[in-house]
Amino acid sequence: MTQYAASAGDAIVDPATHGLDVYAVGGAIRDTLLGLPVQDRDYVVVGATPEAMEARGFRTVGKDFPVFLHPRTQAEYALARTERKTAAGYKGFSVYYAPDVTLEDDLVRRDLTINAMAQRVAEDGALVGPVIDPYGGQADLASRTFRHVSEAFVEDPVRILRVARFAARFAEFHVAPETRALMQRMAEAGEVDALVPERVWQELARGLLEARPSRLFAVLRDCGALVRLLPELDRLWGVPQRADYHPEVDTGVHTMMVVDTAAAMDTPLPVRFAALVHDLGKGTTPADILPRHVGHEARGLPMIEDICRRLRVPTDCRDLAIMVAREHGNIHRSDGFDATALVRLLERCDALRKPERFRQALLACEADARGRLGFEQRDYPQPVRLLRALQAAASIDAGAVAKRYADNPAHIKQAVHVARIEAVAQAGL
């Protein structure tokens, strides 16, 4: 039996929850039924009041609805509640919670049937009794279907992002046609426009970190939400590239192959975001020069900066994305660079001061090179040579050079630059 206690020693009666009607809900039940590790552990308490919870030592943490921290384990327990839409956006709800709210009342407000299941939690922390599944979640798990619980799905635009994120995690699932229709209706009504930027980024970032991030963007694009959230990305579909370099031709298809390749390489979030936006400039290539994309690197930079401002993207993701968009072509071509060109590239990337960020840029470029039809398993030797060049350039003691030019400080920067070139050349690169 699955245990929800903090440790083996918790498999005894818990005085904080003794006598409470407690259920594990949502992702914990879904993942248990799928045979997956349980990541999210949410509890709902039926028939209690805030005062009763506080009297047991629980600490209130919810601002918009009653959520409490267990006095010992710090696990979150929420009172069963219902919600009613009162205004646009994901915060436009009034919440009702009282002892007369049933478990089924609480479950019906949830987004998908596969997240609207529960199981009673015994006083020793074990799950007991049958899975409570009033809305067909187990059947939808079996058919690998994302299906909304009720028409109230349309009241919360975050649910569009959540469905898309779940698609990136559970790539074999599909969106039920009736749920897709609701999502399209929400997008057309502009509901996603009311989302706060931080929440949009939070869901996109979580989706990028899943195994198949391309599925997130496929779902958003299919329902019409992508063009409202990331129009710079949406316009890439249908833009052709040279078939000799890109057998997949379509720039949007290529971009999705790149983010999935970055995911398969188990890269961190900054690399995956850089992979997502590295070719945005191709969406504004003049039609008369297609399928070539001369200057797309520079054209993409202001778009990336605008997205990062708009969605409050973290600095590490923004900085890497800008570097990769600007330099990915040069990194691809670097196998033909001489020592001078190699050092210039390293210095533009600030690789000597931030070598780890440079390594991440190389990962994004490898994902770009391999994210092409027929190139998925091709070797990408550029990082080996560039990292050897970085090691050689880093062997120069800039402080020692500065001392030699103490009387002529204007020449220090150039002298260090020349010394690095000589070191790279002597390394046979």
UniProtKB/Swiss-Prot annotation:
It catalyses: a tRNA precursor + 2 CTP + ATP = a tRNA with a 3' CCA end + 3 diphosphate; a tRNA with a 3' CCA end + 2 CTP + ATP = a tRNA with a 3' CCACCA end + 3 diphosphate. The keyword Acyltransferase does not apply. InterPro entries: CCA_bact, HD/PDEase_dom, HD_domain, NT_sf, PolA_pol_head_dom, PolyA_RNA-bd, tRNA_CCA-adding_enzyme. Residues 251-352 form the HD domain. Magnesium is required for nucleotidyltransferase activity. Keywords: ATP-binding, Hydrolase, Magnesium, Metal-binding, Multifunctional enzyme, Nickel, Nucleotide-binding, Nucleotidyltransferase, RNA repair, RNA-binding, Transferase, tRNA processing. Its EC number is 2.7.7.72, 3.1.3.-, 3.1.4.-. Coiled coil: none annotated. Mg(2+) binds at D40, D42. One of its GO terms (molecular function) is CCA tRNA nucleotidyltransferase activity. ATP binds at G27, R30, R110, R162, R165. One of its GO terms (biological process) is RNA repair. Its cofactor is Mg(2+); Ni(2+). NCBIfam families: PRK10885.1. A single active site specifically recognizes both ATP and CTP and is responsible for their addition. Monomer. Can also form homodimers and oligomers. This is Multifunctional CCA protein. It comes from Ralstonia nicotianae (strain ATCC BAA-1114 / GMI1000).
